[in-house]
Amino acid sequence: MTDVVDADELLRRMHRARACALEQERTWRGRRDELRTTDPEGSHEAAVRSLAYEAVLRVLDEVLTPGRNTA
């Protein structure tokens, strides 16, 4: 963890983190929808996880493209 990282590498890592967070958010949202009728508790947990990844996406979007997603 003591590696020196240049700005381009940091930007690449943040883009990879955003792509991963987007994939996870979609996965948990889909799981929430699948479990809605059969497992309400599991559906709730999946919804919470989906919201957590959505928050990560918002933060990374603001870091990577400041002011673009103002809502």
Give the positions of each predicted feature:
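Short, charge-rich amphipathic interface segments used for partner binding and complex assembly
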Residues: 23, 27-70
